[in-house]
């Protein structure tokens, strides 16, 4: 039997509040929506749940508020097989929320998202200090940018010092220090985040411009990133590392109804 990898996810919980509408309101305007949904999410929780569904042993470290959203999100992750025993509760701050306006048309849907981090942003280095010794017991550490950057940089350095691979999804896009980039065994931005961090856009207007990809890849390698994975939406993904640059096409879909799914 294959060993189940032990994955540590240090990241966010966000309750998605999704309002679907034919047209997003202008400033000062009210429109009648099509429907409203709530969905437990957060980039960290989503990573944890998907890894658990793929068979990994997953421990989630994060923070929620002392409210219904916090309880729903931790229960949802636990029901997927994620160990949430290290998820803390901030009794003075609300759980994180993502407010999503989903503009639906006959051609698909576009989203506009406002994130209120809440308790995610009150998680401190002191709260996760126990990881400094425990982190060596994991096969991989996964993080995103919905926590305070000090927490992300500190945990990434602990993992690197312990020889544990680190995967970072730099979203939402934010400046990355050379120290943090050098800790990333795997960096997985989308094309917009990659352009911001590398200082060079990737043209996908007529297909993927591989010269742009090569420039971006070299920029990251020069700052210490070992392996780069760039997601390109309908244009697939790029994997770049010591073996070169590889472009993988995505599965073509006739219609995408919900980009938040």
What are these language model-derived features?
Residues 1-27:
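Positively charged, low-complexity intrinsically disordered leader regions
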Residues 4, 15, 27-31, 38, ...:
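Conserved N-terminal subdomain of the carbohydrate kinase-like
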Residues 17-18, 114, 197-200:
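Residues that scaffold the ATP/ADP-binding catalytic core of kinase and kinase-like folds
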Residues 37-40, 44-47, 232, 250-261:
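Short glycine/threonine-rich catalytic loop with a Thr-x-Gly-x-Asp
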Residues 41-58, 217-223:
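A short, N-terminal amphipathic alpha-helix
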Residues 48-50, 54-56, 195-196, 256-261:
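Short, small-residue alpha-helix embedded
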Residues 153-247, 252-255:
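Conserved phosphate/ATP/ADP-binding segment of small-molecule kinases
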